[in-house]
Amino acid sequence: MAADAFLLIFGLLLTVLIVAQPLGSGLARLIEGETGTLLQKFETKTARFFALDTTEMRWQQYAAAILALNLIGIVVLFVLLMAQGNLPLNPENMPGLSWHLALNTAVSFVTNTNWQAYSGENTLSYLSQMVGLTVQNFLSAASGIAVAFALIRAFSRRCVDTLGNAWLDLLRITLYVLLPLSLLLALFFVSQGVLQNLLPYQHLTTLDGAAQTLPMGPVASQEAIKLLGTNGGGFFGANSAHPFENPTALSNIVQMLAILLIPTALCFAFGKAVSDKRQGHALLWAMALIFIVAAAVVMKMEVTGNPHLLALGADSAANLEGKETRFGVLTSSLYAVVTTATSTGAVNAMHDSFTALGGMVPLWLMQIGEVVFGGVGSGLYGMLLFVLLTVFIAGLMIGRSPEYLGKKIEVYEMKMTALAILIPPALVLLGTALALSTEAGRGGILNPGAHGFSEVLYAVSSAANNNGSAFAGLSVNTPFYNVLLAVAMLLGRFAVMVPVLAIAGSLVVKKRQPESKGSLSTRSPLFIGMLIAIVLLIGALTFIPALALGPVAEHLQFGLTH
């Protein structure tokens, strides 16, 4: 079993690294604005058609453009979901959503969270899935990558006050990266048996005479960008555990590759854009080491499972509850780590059915800000925030002015860094406290005790860190939870994005100092170790008390009870 786990983890990471390198080179060219003559003519015509201003933007203009696009997206999607009962491509006559569910869903997909307080096959029309959710999957992913592009330019440029053009970045990312990759991945999924049609649901009679309804729909096209864009919202309620979304072991492995592809490629792109590939490699080492340990722990917990089952006559103590037999314990455990280390939130097993400590690791991966690969764009700029914090602390320790890639890190950058790092944990802890201190919040808890607390903590952690996965034992389709989590998703996304762009705007105007003998090496094993330590320390100081009340207490209760 240990050998199988080793092969799964390292085989996945090795394949991702091989595939992501050429993509990273392409992304680096996009960061520098190198698109080629033919593509440049096409994007110029497209920009003219949409009347886009393609002049370079300062950070305030860049942030305003990103915020405006996302605000419009929330309004349009909200209206579409409310009105879907009166719109075409609705063969099952799905009614419009309630205002609070429509608000929650609109915010969820625009912020790249894809939290779902509904089951797609019972709630949404094909039009809502295609024109509403799938479009936002592209735009939210492009928004995150665009902000990462702006921050990378802040390090690669010097003595200018612009970060690029948000509209051109969004256009290029969508046309040259997300659409081609999604098309290829969707075709692969169709070859594996994922649905792609506009047929009405099929009503059948089984061999034993029972009635059965098989949902249909344009699944493969949404599934591709759901994974590549680290969105995670499933076409069906069971998400990637559903055989119409993830039918085979091969499709399951490819899904994990697709989730990790762009976050990994962005690290390579970062190194190439700043003319020091080892900087990108250092970030990847830090991410990969945390990922490997997290995956090993979850696999160990789920394989160990419940030893008391053996005394009851079970063939194995492994925790198979909530898992698909076509994937098994190890692959389901690895998928859980992949989807929570990134901001994806797609699931091929029910996280609520994991062991107490096995479920704690995905929860903790979200709580540290999803910087272990992270979401497309957001993972890179999230990890760079921790890099700046590490550089600052190291500078204090050795008595030197902190700098990163030749740019001095001063008071303003540290204020913005602290703000961006602390906002999501504050949202998690305050949101959980609010839910547990109100009748409306406690009313959604279906499981008493420590596990019920864990379900609330997981839900708010998932929303505030834009993940979207859930411990599904919590009843969240209520006005209280829909509004609470919508606010957490909005602030968790944009209250981090804006400080990141502010940091970029401050750094881009600075001179890039040459590296000297006294400069702190930010690509050495020592720095990688310090970076990992800072990430773990921030996570530990912030969340150990909450985790002790939830998963740890549940684990101890299990041991005492049995």
Swiss-Prot record:
Entry GO MF terms: P-type potassium transmembrane transporter activity; potassium ion binding
Keyword vocabulary terms for this entry: Cell inner membrane, Cell membrane, Ion transport, Membrane, Potassium, Potassium transport, Transmembrane, Transmembrane helix, Transport
Cellular-component GO terms for this entry: plasma membrane
Its membrane topology: Multi-pass membrane protein
A Pfam family hit: KdpA
Subcellular location(s) of the protein: Cell inner membrane
Residues that span the membrane, as ranges: 5-25, 63-83, 132-152, 175-195, 250-270, 279-299, 379-399, 416-436, 483-503, 526-546
Similarity remark: Belongs to the KdpA family.
Function: Part of the high-affinity ATP-driven potassium transport (or Kdp) system, which catalyzes the hydrolysis of ATP coupled with the electrogenic transport of potassium into the cytoplasm. This subunit binds the periplasmic potassium ions and delivers the ions to the membrane domain of KdpB through an intramembrane tunnel.
PANTHER family: POTASSIUM-TRANSPORTING ATPASE A CHAIN, POTASSIUM-TRANSPORTING ATPASE POTASSIUM-BINDING SUBUNIT
Subunit description: The system is composed of three essential subunits: KdpA, KdpB and KdpC.
Protein name per UniProt: Potassium-transporting ATPase potassium-binding subunit
